[in-house]
């Protein structure tokens, strides 16, 4: 089995992005699952173009996109993506779409194709804080989650897919007093559990 796991490049003046720091630290194989890692640009449209190319070439059994949610303290298991870009800040190429539809022929929203409640149970067993989240925002994270689920539906693919938000890691909060964070090792462990739980349930 093949799992495509994506993370983002740093954005908004951050020097690192915990999503890619964790994804790039995953082993290349977990049990009998081949782990394929992909770094996405934090850029509207270019991010899904790179993702779609990889989906076509790799043909994975599961796709888990990971992004940064600074200020959250837990692993956020995103339930739904909405068909709108409404950026509060500029992306890494200066784009700032406001109230723009992502795909004109797409549904208003798509639900995660990951077993998010079961994942939460498994993470709780090993004392990793997690929660089901009902909003992935309207920046590039929601953009890529929606695009992934749109692609799966549009192409009638029988694969699992969804999005996970992760907190800042230790290196990012040295100048941010009282800001929630999680160690990179804990995020990596969480991703391993998410991958296995998603594929085996």
Swiss-Prot record:
GO terms for biological process: proteolysis. The active site is at 78, 141, 165. Its EC number is 3.4.19.3. It catalyses: Release of an N-terminal pyroglutamyl group from a polypeptide, the second amino acid generally not being Pro. GO terms for molecular function: pyroglutamyl-peptidase activity. GO terms for cellular component: cytosol. Its main location: cytoplasm. CDD domains: Peptidase_C15 (cd00501). Keywords: Cytoplasm, Hydrolase, Protease, Thiol protease. It comes from the Bacteria. PANTHER family: PROTEASE FAMILY C15 PYROGLUTAMYL-PEPTIDASE I-RELATED (PTHR23402), PYROGLUTAMYL-PEPTIDASE I (PTHR23402:SF1). Removes 5-oxoproline from various penultimate amino acid residues except L-proline. This is Pyrrolidone-carboxylate peptidase.
């Amino acid at each position: 089995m093949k799992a495509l796991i994506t993370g983002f490049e740093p954005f908004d003046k951050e020097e690192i992005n915990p999503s890619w720091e964790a994804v790039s630290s995953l082993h290349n194989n977990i049990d009998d699952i081949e782990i394929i890692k992909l770094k996405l640009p934090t850029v509207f449209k270019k991010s899904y173009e790179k993702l779609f190319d990889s989906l076509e070439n790799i043909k994975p059994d599961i796709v888990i996109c990971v992004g940064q949610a600074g200020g959250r303290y837990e692993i956020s298991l995103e339930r739904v993506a909405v068909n709108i870009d409404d950026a509060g800040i500029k992306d890494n190429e200066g784009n700032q779409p406001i109230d723009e539809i992502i795909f004109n022929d797409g549904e208003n929203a798509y639900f995660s194709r990951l077993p998010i409640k079961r994942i939460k149970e498994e993470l709780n067993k090993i004392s990793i804080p997690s929660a089901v989240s009902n909003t992935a925002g309207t920046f590039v994270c929601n953009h890529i989650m929606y695009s992934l689920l749109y692609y799966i539906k549009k192409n009638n693919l029988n694969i699992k897919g969804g999005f996970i938000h992760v907190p800042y890691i230790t290196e990012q909060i040295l100048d941010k007093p009282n800001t929630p964070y999680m160690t990179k090792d804990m995020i990596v462990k969480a991703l391993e559990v998410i991958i296995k739980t998603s594929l085996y349930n």
